[in-house]
């Protein structure tokens, strides 16, 4: 029986996705985003920095879906978009969120952003009562109450995005 020997300096998990694919639209790049495996094979003493671990852990909750007995909720970080640049609608059994803004100047140059998200709604969500709120810190909250029936308020419709001046700390559970 052969046993594969793995060197300690090469134990870096190869499955970690790069921040290029995360939801940090235009937040800048780090060296390990462009060359993720070069630094782990060069030095046997290389370790992740504490700052990198913090960034990876802060990824959770960027888009969060909650469904309990009474309501269905979606939390989405859209801090780079204003309510006028967001379009939220219910189409068939999905809630769709689109955001788009033109070219703007930031610290790194010029950037334009666009995204499209779709979330399947449970069959007992009252689609006619779905609301959408954007908090002051850029957290979009979509809330739909659940009803006893299975076909309440079905159909395509646009949902207005209302602005809330309070910050939203609910998703970090």
From Swiss-Prot:
| Xref: InterPro entries | A-crystallin/Hsp20_dom, Alpha-crystallin/HSP_16, Alpha-crystallin/sHSP_animal, Alpha-crystallin_N, HSP20-like_chaperone
Coarse class of the primary localization is: cytoplasm
**Annotated ranges, domain sHSP:** 53-164
Disordered: annotated span: 143-173
Sites of N-acetylmethionine modification: 1
Q: Name one GO cellular component term.
A: nucleus
What SUPFAM superfamilies does the entry give? Answer: HSP20-like chaperones
Keywords assigned by UniProt, alphabetized: Acetylation, Cytoplasm, Disulfide bond, Eye lens protein, Metal-binding, Nucleus, Zinc
Binding residues for Zn(2+) 2, per the UniProt record? Answer: 108
Disulphide bonds in the chain: 132-143
Question: What does this protein's UniProt record list under function?
Answer: Contributes to the transparency and refractive index of the lens. May act as a chaperone, preventing aggregation of various proteins under a wide range of stress conditions.
**Family designation:** Belongs to the small heat shock protein (HSP20) family.
This protein is called what? Answer: Alpha-crystallin A chain
């Amino acid at each position: 029986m052969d046993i594969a020997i793995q060197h300690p300096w090469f134990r870096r998990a190869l499955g970690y996705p790069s921040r290029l694919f995360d939801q940090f639209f235009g937040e800048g790049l780090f060296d390990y985003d462009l060359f993720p495996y070069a630094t782990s094979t060069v030095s046997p003493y290389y370790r992740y920095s504490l700052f990198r671990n913090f960034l990876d852990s802060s990824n959770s909750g960027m888009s969060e879906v909650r469904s309990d007995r009474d309501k269905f909720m979606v939390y989405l970080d859209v801090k780079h978009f204003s309510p006028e640049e967001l379009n939220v609608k219910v189409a068939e059994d999905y809630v769709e969120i689109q955001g788009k803004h033109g070219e703007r100047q930031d610290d790194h140059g010029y950037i334009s952003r666009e995204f499209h998200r779709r979330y399947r709604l449970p069959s007992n969500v009252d689609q006619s009562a779905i609301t959408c709120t954007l908090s002051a810190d850029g957290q979009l909250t979509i809330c739909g109450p659940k009803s006893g029936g299975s076909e309440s308020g079905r159909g395509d419709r646009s949902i207005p995005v209302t602005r809330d001046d309070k910050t939203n700390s609910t998703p970090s559970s």
